């Protein structure tokens, strides 16, 4: 069994925030692969079904970002899901907008959701890093991630979510690099090759 966890904050107030792109991506996967309706369990919203012939649990923790690990750990423990079968979809300041990278293990890059999961579960889970760019100054990060995507950003956000949904079977099949490459080619074909964060700030 596999666990796809999207990171974000619960409730309509945060639904459109840049910090919630992980929620958006996992919701797109659930819709694309017709998993079950969302229900409340494991301190979050869950949906179940099959992707590429394997059982998948989708989870959106409702603990708020800083406590995401509680929900992920509870679900993983209940279903005995090993770390190598856990994929965490999250916003990534250190990637330009519309870039997707996948890696197993590594640091948390200041991301409180990842920090919580690592503390609760260990480090060797997969991160699906969804680039949102950087506002240009550390002092601006908090307001940047907790603001909604602007109208000019919505096309690439939708394309990123589509890529995650369409190519999710590659993650299930143990082909993380293939997922990343196919997502890159898809986003490139859509014209999202050099997207800048709103305001022209850096995206390193």
Swiss-Prot record:
The active site is at residue 19. GO terms for molecular function: peptidyl-tRNA hydrolase activity; tRNA binding. TRNA binds at residues 14, 64, 66, 112. It holds the Pfam family Pept_tRNA_hydro. The record marks 91 as: Stabilizes the basic form of H active site to accept a proton. InterPro entries: Pept_tRNA_hydro (IPR001328), Pept_tRNA_hydro_CS (IPR018171), Pept_tRNA_hydro_sf (IPR036416). Its main location: cytoplasm. Transmembrane segments: none annotated. The keyword RNA-binding applies. GO terms for biological process: protein quality control for misfolded or incompletely synthesized proteins; rescue of stalled ribosome. It is found in: Cytoplasm. Its EC number is 3.1.1.29. The keyword Repeat does not apply. It catalyses: an N-acyl-L-alpha-aminoacyl-tRNA + H2O = an N-acyl-L-amino acid + a tRNA + H(+). HAMAP family: Pept_tRNA_hydro_bact. Belongs to the PTH family. Hydrolyzes ribosome-free peptidyl-tRNAs (with 1 or more amino acids incorporated), which drop off the ribosome during protein synthesis, or as a result of ribosome stalling. Catalyzes the release of premature peptidyl moieties from peptidyl-tRNA molecules trapped in stalled 50S ribosomal subunits, and thus maintains levels of free tRNAs and 50S ribosomes. This is Peptidyl-tRNA hydrolase. The lineage of its organism: Bacteria, Pseudomonadati, Pseudomonadota, Alphaproteobacteria, Hyphomicrobiales. The gene is pth.
